[in-house]
Amino acid sequence: MHLQPKDQEKLLVVVAADLARRRQARGLKLNHPEAIAIITYELLEGARDGRTVAELMSWGSTILSREDVMEGVPEMIPDVQVEATFPDGTKLVTVHDPIR
């Protein structure tokens, strides 16, 4: 299987988010990379499902809460930016303060 670099990055996000969700299901609090992976994955999938940029920007701050992550992680992530593929092209989605 030959994947372009962009597709390799997306696959890495999927694997990282899956691992993070498994750890979360075991009751573990998420660290910085795990939180980023889950938020990124959900935004990419939301775009694929046809949600708008505005919807994703709003929804992105509800994916994880402070209770889901280790202490200090919310302050380490002031925003998340994801280049997502929408039905009408690729757009940048920015979520400010994604963990509240």
UniProtKB/Swiss-Prot annotation:
An example Gene Ontology molecular-function term: urease activity
InterPro entries reported for this sequence: Urease_gamma, Urease_gamma/gamma-beta_su, Urease_gamma_sf, Urease_subunit
GO biological process terms held by the UniProt record: urea catabolic process
Chief place of localization: cytoplasm
Pathway named in the protein's UniProt entry: Nitrogen metabolism; urea degradation; CO(2) and NH(3) from urea (urease route): step 1/1
Gene Ontology CC: one annotated term: cytoplasm
UniProt-listed Gene3D superfamilies: Urease, gamma-like subunit (3.30.280.10)
Enzyme Commission number, as recorded: 3.5.1.5
Substrates-to-products reaction catalysed: urea + 2 H2O + H(+) = hydrogencarbonate + 2 NH4(+)
Record's subcellular location: Cytoplasm
Pfam family, one: Urease_gamma
Keywords: Cytoplasm, Hydrolase
Keyword Ion transport listed: no
Superkingdom of origin organism: Bacteria
Similarity comment text for this entry: Belongs to the urease gamma subunit family.
NCBIfam families: PRK13241.1, urease_gam
Quaternary structure (record): Heterotrimer of UreA (gamma), UreB (beta) and UreC (alpha) subunits. Three heterotrimers associate to form the active enzyme.
Protein name: Urease subunit gamma
Organism taxonomic ancestry: Bacteria, Bacillati, Actinomycetota, Actinomycetes, Micrococcales
